[in-house]
């Protein structure tokens, strides 16, 4: 595999994957296809060698452009997505366009040229789970984590659009022989994440002298994974995964939002209660938890960032050291949240 396309490669998770490939696979040339919406940033690719990484500014819904690029590549890794739940509740239309129509455009081109395709998705397609304390197996029993066999039950316009794209990929594999795999990952954290998201929002609030905000009671649980571990898992699936299979990516990082925020405040030298509780998101999923045993057992993948505290400290340090990357957008992001009382 000498040439790959990474859609959304100037965004958070996509750009981290590009860095991972450049740092670990010197034989691979990466073409980044990114629309550079508010969540895409050329600066995320700064410092990468020009002979290894090419940025094409364009829309994955542009069938002519996609066709031109796909016919010259060995594989497409599809990260590009509208992904912020709060935005999907205000205006679902970009989520339908990018996440469904864009994915369709890509798989059609990959089908036409018989190009390997990997579809990056989310655990949110499965809906949510009860809290561990309310389950007979305390979160470890049968059906108490998401598996590749879990029934889809999306609860937001965002997760519904991702579920739709997953199902298109499955249908194209079965109907047309598309050379595809799917991964559904838990919540990512790490460098280059847009400051509208939970962890970077709170870090940059503290750095800006703004009190952090917690939705509702903060008991909602997310299964956190460092984005570097997500990148290594996607590479393992791309190169070793079985065509037509779905792999779940997780690092056993379950934490509720309140605990994450209090740990973040502690690591930043602030009182653990120095935050404001604000109104909850409508339809806020209660708990996500990933069973990644298939990925680990079949492909031999293991996460490296198994200590959430050290991973969070690493992330805090990155935002502290890179204020120029996020500072210009901070006021607008907080003003947007303030309109919703959040």
Whereabouts are the PLM-identified features?
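N-terminal Rossmann-like NAD(P)+-binding domain of SDR-like oxidoreductases, especially those catalyzing
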Residues: 1-188, 318-322, 328-342
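C-terminal substrate-binding subdomain of Rossmann-fold SDR/epimerase-dehydratase oxidoreductases
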Residues: 4, 17, 30, 58, ...
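Amphipathic alpha-helical recognition patches that constitute DNA-binding helices
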Residues: 12, 156, 190, 197, ...
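Conserved strand-to-helix beginnings and helix N-cap segments that scaffold or border functional pockets
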Residues: 42, 67, 89, 195-196, ...
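A glycine/serine/threonine-rich, flexible loop-to-helix segment
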Residues: 48, 132, 195-203
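Glutamine-centric residue-chemistry signal
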Residues: 78, 193, 202, 219-220
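The catalytic Tyr-centered alpha-helix of NAD(P)H-dependent dehydrogenases
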Residues: 150, 154-161, 191, 195-199, ...
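Hydrophobic alpha-helix immediately C-terminal to the catalytic Tyr-X-X-X-Lys motif of short-chain
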Residues: 164, 168, 172, 202, ...
């Amino acid at each position: 595999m000498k040439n790959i396309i990474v859609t959304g490669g100037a965004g958070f998770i996509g750009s981290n994957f590009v860095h991972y490939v450049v740092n670990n696979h010197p034989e691979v040339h990466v073409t980044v296809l990114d629309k550079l919406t508010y969540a895409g940033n050329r600066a995320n690719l700064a410092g990468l060698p020009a002979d290894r990484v090419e940025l094409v500014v364009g829309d994955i819904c542009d069938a002519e452009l996609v066709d031109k690029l796909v016919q010259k590549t060995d594989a497409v890794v599809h990260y590009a997505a509208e992904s912020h739940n709060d935005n999907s509740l205000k205006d679902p239309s970009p989520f339908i366009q990018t996440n469904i129509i864009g994915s369709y455009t890509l798989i059609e081109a990959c089908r036409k040229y018989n190009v390997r395709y990997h579809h990056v998705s989310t655990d949110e397609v499965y809906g949510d789970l009860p809290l561990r304390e309310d389950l007979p197996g305390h979160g470890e029993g049968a059906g108490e984590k998401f598996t590749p066999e879990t029934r889809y039950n999306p609860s937001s316009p965002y997760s519904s659009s991702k579920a739709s794209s997953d199902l298109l990929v499955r249908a194209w594999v079965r109907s047309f022989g598309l050379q595809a795999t799917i991964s559904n990952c838990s919540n990512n954290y790490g460098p280059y994440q847009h400051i509208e998201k939970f962890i970077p929002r709170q870090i940059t609030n503290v750095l800006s002298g703004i009190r952090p905000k917690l939705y509702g009671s903060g008991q909602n649980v997310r299964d956190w994974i460092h984005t570097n571990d997500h990148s290594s898992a996607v590479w393992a699936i791309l190169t070793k995964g079985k065509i037509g299979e779905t792999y779940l990516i997780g690092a056993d990082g379950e934490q509720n939002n309140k605990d994450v925020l209090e740990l973040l405040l502690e690591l930043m030298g602030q009182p653990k209660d120095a935050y404001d509780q604000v109104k909850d998101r409508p339809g806020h999923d209660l708990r996500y938890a990933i069973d990644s045993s298939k990925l680990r057992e079949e492909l031999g993948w293991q996460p490296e960032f198994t200590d959430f505290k050290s991973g969070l400290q690493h992330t805090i340090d990155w935002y502290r050291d890179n204020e120029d990357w996020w500072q210009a957008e901070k006021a607008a992001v907080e003003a947007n949240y303030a309109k919703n009382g959040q």
